[in-house]
Amino acid sequence: MSTGHTVLGCQTTDKTVVTLFIILVLLCLVAVVGNGFIIIALGMKWLLRRTLSAHNKLLISLAASRFCLQCVVIGKNIYVFLNPTSFPYNPVIQLLNLMWDFLTAATIWLCSLLGFFYCVKIATLTHPVFVWLKYRLPGWVPWMLLSAVGMSSLTSILCFIGNYMIYQNHAKSGHQPWNVTGNSLRHSLEKFYFFSIKIIMWTIPTVVFSIFMSLLLVSLVRHMKKTFLALSELRDVWAQAHFKALLPLLSFIVLFISCFLTLVLSSASNTPYQEFRYWMWQVVIHLCTVIHPIVILFSNPVLRVVIKRGCC
């Protein structure tokens, strides 16, 4: 199931919708290029050195997930733009939604795991559990990635079952839009089943992300206060350096939470494909996802070096 499911009879396309569609495609293309660059840069390093840090393994996995997601989004939205009144559970959209559900859940889980990794590796907490995790965490990355794939697969399968039930019911009714039983089943699944699955499966990693990011920020603020008092002569230089270091982290938090909220609101709205609101939600969601790869490109040391070499 995607964010818009109601079919209307109108075949006309509003100019505003066309504009939003073009903006959406351009945003997705920028995200594809940004994530593709991350994949190539880190992938080349992995091939040349035969090794990659745990942090960069998470980054390349997140970039790959986002790269594929943006490609699916482009394909799906081109299809629904050209076929705005098609049945939203037909086999083509079912396949696109299956990939969208999997990749969206995978992206959320990978962001959550990246936040957990940042907290454990960067936080200055001295609790024995954190000290123990610092040494154990790099070896857990493959299992973390596998768990993200598993949870994402579960989400997509559960949503696909609901999509398939609606399509089968629609096919049995002879594709009649006024079939009361079919419409009742569809509205019930859209209102309760799909939304509940996505809220649960998206909220769990978001809560994990929020907890560990809060711990990290508290730890960093405490550390900054102590250092600020100790280095009275270099306060301006020190403050500027720490602000630059904190900016990517803060942007990651803001963009992740913004993307989560827009996904939830978009799923709750159940807007028809050809309506202005559907395309507006799509633009807002993917505006959040296009900014973070750019932040990563200019904040990650490995990627920054590649960019500088490319510009020279």
Curated annotation (Swiss-Prot):
Residue intervals on the Extracellular side: 1-19, 88-97, 162-198, 266-277
Signal peptide: none
UniProt keyword list: G-protein coupled receptor, Glycoprotein, Membrane, Receptor, Sensory transduction, Taste, Transducer, Transmembrane, Transmembrane helix
GO biological process: detection of chemical stimulus involved in sensory perception of bitter taste
CDD domains (alphabetical): 7tm_TAS2R41-like
Pfam family, one: TAS2R
Domain of life: Eukaryota
GO cellular component: membrane
Other comments on record: Several bitter taste receptors are expressed in a single taste receptor cell.
PANTHER family documented for this protein: TASTE RECEPTOR TYPE 2 (PTHR11394), TASTE RECEPTOR TYPE 2 MEMBER 60 (PTHR11394:SF32)
UniProt name for this protein: Taste receptor type 2 member 135
Organism: Mus musculus
